[in-house]
Amino acid sequence: KKGKKNMASSLMHYAITDKILQLFPMHDGARLRFGAVLPDASVNKRKTHFRVYSEKLGIRLYDLEAYRAQFGKRMQKDDLYLGYYLHLIEDALYRKTLYDTFGWNPYTPESTARMHHDYTLLNRHFIQKYNIRDDLAVPENFTQEPIFAFEPFDAEGLLRSIHQNFVPAPADAPY
């Protein structure tokens, strides 16, 4: 699965955002949730995740300052843009934990395949444990949003992919 080998699953972003909304109600929770999964709705993940290469460190980093420079004012007024920013922070923390704390190597096919299998198992667990609803929707007039001009996201495709997590597993599935 090209482009998803080192990020938390979209459903995990949804679950985290749902929990945040329970603790800190926002003006528009639906837009916050949608924004929190939006960076994964593109094949150009480096661009949508504001990833830049650091010569000094020899790795790609999340350029949160670039996101704030481009969308910071909107982020203060529009929960979609705040949700998008939350996604970037979650991914940065996830990578730091996975790589630095646990020493995970994303460059082997075995570890990537194992992680995607784990996502499948965890996604179903999160749906049940946190009572996650299959209610994400593309906001009205989304294609008119400045963020859509930044990258023409395949939001409908992402929602179809997330929806697949809610389809019951076959009876013979191990989990």
Can you say where each PLM-predicted feature lies in the sequence?
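N-terminal leader/auxiliary helical segments
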Residues: 2-175
